[in-house]
Swiss-Prot record:
It comes from the Bacteria. It comes from Borreliella burgdorferi (strain ATCC 35210 / DSM 4680 / CIP 102532 / B31) (Borrelia burgdorferi). PANTHER family: PHOSPHATE ACETYLTRANSFERASE. GO terms for cellular component: cytoplasm. Its EC number is 2.3.1.8. Belongs to the phosphate acetyltransferase and butyryltransferase family. One of its GO terms (biological process) is acetyl-CoA biosynthetic process. This is Phosphate acetyltransferase. Pathway: Metabolic intermediate biosynthesis; acetyl-CoA biosynthesis; acetyl-CoA from acetate: step 2/2. It is an enzyme of class 2 (transferase). GO terms for molecular function: phosphate acetyltransferase activity. It catalyses: acetyl-CoA + phosphate = acetyl phosphate + CoA.
Length: 352
């Protein structure tokens, strides 16, 4: 059998192009705040982002002299220094306004405004407030800070989208990140979204339904393509019965009642969801089975293990996790992230 070996879709090029278009059309809004300027990966990424015109400007949180001196250690940054703003929370002119806002958000009896000032001066908290006030379009962090710190600050400060009850996350899996046999191309041009992989530990039916709806929206917003959502399980269409499968079935009914036009099905085993030959045998009438591009896992164990299996054994490129459900784009990086991964996450935050 002859196979076709070529790259049909480059996710990185696609996202970079979208980011550049946004920058061109929305210059004053196309900026990112990086609160972790002490990390050399963040500084290198900031330089690359500006040189590739993936953002109009960058805000770095820290002591101005320290940050500028660190930047100047990279010989290739002189041409973009004018597009970098270094902000020190301790000398920020609107710090009292930020403190007032943060205090109003806490809703804690007996807590004085001044007692919260140390928290507001924290780089992550301060950066989230900058996004809330519209000083920056997006906050990209997590290279140094834990996911718990990033998420807790975002939950306190960044409003949710209207109607959203829970925040969740998704991974973008690029299964065609290198030249491969395109006769076995999964998802949308080799791209699949996995959710939830990092936030909601054991979602109930309502939460699972919301994760599915949010992930479908994220897929459509990012790729401008039609989502086909599979609610995964160890069972396909009643092949096994347990409380775990009932949770998935209930989630399916909730989604269909809320958004009847969405292509979604469940419960589906993984092979039924993505392999057409298997889908033909197990669930021929399904409009999703065999061609799903958004995979919703029943719990965090399955989602987290699942994406890492695909990344390590299938050599897919894993981007994320990306938070969804917030009204502002927030990215929680892995502490093991590379410069390239920071650049990609930043471009994605600008493009949406």
């Amino acid at each position: 059998m002859l196979y076709s070996f070529y790259k049909v879709f480059c996710l990185k090029d696609y996202v970079f192009k979208k980011a550049r278009i946004f920058v061109k059309e929305n210059k004053l809004k196309a900026n990112i705040v990086f609160p972790e300027s002490s990390d050399s990966r963040v500084l290198k990424a900031a330089i690359v982002i500006l040189q590739k015109n993936l953002a109009d400007s960058i805000i770095l949180i820290g002591k101005k002299d320290t940050v500028i001196n660190s930047l100047k250690e990279f010989s290739n940054c002189n041409d973009i220094l004018g597009r970098i703003e270094v902000v020190d929370p301790n000398s920020f002119p609107d710090i009292e306004m930020y403190l007032d806002e943060y205090w109003s958000l806490q809703k804690l009896k007996g807590v004085t405004k001044q007692s919260l000032k140390t928290q507001v001066l924290d780089e992550i908290t301060f950066a989230m407030l900058m996004v809330r006030f519209g000083y920056a379009k997006s906050c990209v962090c997590g290279a140094v800070s834990t996911s718990a710190k990033v998420l807790s600050n975002a939950l306190r400060i960044i409003p949710k989208l209207e109607g959203v009850k829970i925040i969740s996350s998704f991974m973008i899996m690029d299964t065609l990140c290198t030249a491969r046999n395109v006769d076995f191309c999964f998802g949308h041009n080799g791209i699949l979204f996995f959710a939830d992989c990092s936030v909601v530990v054991n979602p109930n039916s309502l939460e699972l339904a919301e994760i599915a709806l949010q992930s479908a929206k994220s897929f459509k917003d990012i790729l401008n393509a039609k989502p086909k959502v599979a609610l995964l399980s160890f069972s396909t269409k009643g092949s096994s019965s347990a409380k775990e499968t009932e949770k998935v079935k209930n989630a399916l009914n909730i989604v269909r009642n809320k958004e009847s036009d969405l292509l979604i099905d469940g419960e589906l085993q993984l092979d039924s969801a993505i392999i057409k030959d298997v889908a033909e045998k197990k669930c021929r009438e399904s409009l999703v089975a065999g061609s799903a591009n958004v995979l919703i896992f029943p719990n965090l164990d399955a989602g987290n293990i699942g994406y890492k299996l695909v990344e390590r054994f299938a050599f897919a490129k894993a981007y994320g996790p990306f938070l969804q459900g917030f009204s502002k784009p927030i990215s929680d990086l892995s502490r093991g992230c590379s410069v390239d991964e920071i650049v990609f996450a930043s471009a994605l935050m600008i493009s949406i």
